[in-house]
Design a protein with these regions (language model features):
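Conserved Rossmann-fold NAD(P)-dependent oxidoreductase catalytic core, especially the SDR/UDP-sugar
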Residues: 89-127
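NAD(P)H-binding glycine-rich loop region in Rossmannoid oxidoreductase-like domains
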Residues: 47-91
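Conserved beta-loop-beta element that borders a ligand/cofactor-binding pocket
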Residues: 137-151
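N-terminal Rossmann-fold NAD(P) dinucleotide-binding loop
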Residues: 15-16
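Glycine-rich Rossmann-fold phosphate-binding loop(s) that bind the pyrophosphate
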Residues: 11-12, 150
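N-terminal Rossmann-fold cofactor-binding loop
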Residues: 31-37, 53-54
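Aromatic pocket-lining residues of Rossmann-like dinucleotide-binding sites
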Residues: 22
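Conserved N-terminal Rossmann-fold NAD(P)-binding element of oxidoreductases
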Residues: 5-11
């Protein structure tokens, strides 16, 4: 039986929590970090942690992407460009598994004293929000990713 592998771009705060929860239900974890030596998987988890350089494609990451069943990206855009799509667009475009993109609520307009939910039309007012909104649209167009907006 083939192992279930989840590939997570960006093992930061959200990525680490996702990795831990997926690992608890039987998924093998491969993830990236700009500084892999700072990541310590909890308990006896044996995660594969790869270095991620926003300006470099690596064959090792490509090989693990091709061996994964799900891919999640938590990496924020840099200068209005998504670094994951910049390097791995062609692989992600052809990926047949499930893809998720973790975005942010900064894509919504300021709504003092009002609820914001998935029916609220995105209208970012900050540079970070605009970059996230652009990245969401690109992930959807290229991969059909499910978009999650976290606060």
């Amino acid at each position: 039986m083939r192992k279930k592998t989840a590939f997570i771009f960006g093992l930061g705060y959200v990525g680490l929590h996702l990795a831990h929860q997926l690992n608890l239900i039987g998924w093998d974890i491969v993830g990236t970090s700009r500084n892999p030596k700072k990541i310590s998987p909890p308990g006896n988890c044996t995660w594969k942690i790869l270095p991620f350089d926003v300006d470099s494609f690596t064959n090792e990451i490509e090989a693990h992407l091709l061996d994964s069943q799900i891919i999640i990206s938590t990496i924020a855009p840099i200068k209005c460009n998504d670094p994951v799509l910049k390097q791995y667009r062609n692989i992600l475009k052809q990926f047949s598994g499930w893809i998720g993109y973790i975005s942010a609520t900064s894509v919504y307009p300021s709504q003092p004293n009002r609820w914001v939910d998935e029916t609220t039309v995105p209208k970012p007012a900050t540079a970070r929000g605009i970059a996230r909104w652009k990245a969401e649209q690109e992930w959807d167009e290229v991969t059909g990713a499910e978009i999650f907006r976290v606060a």
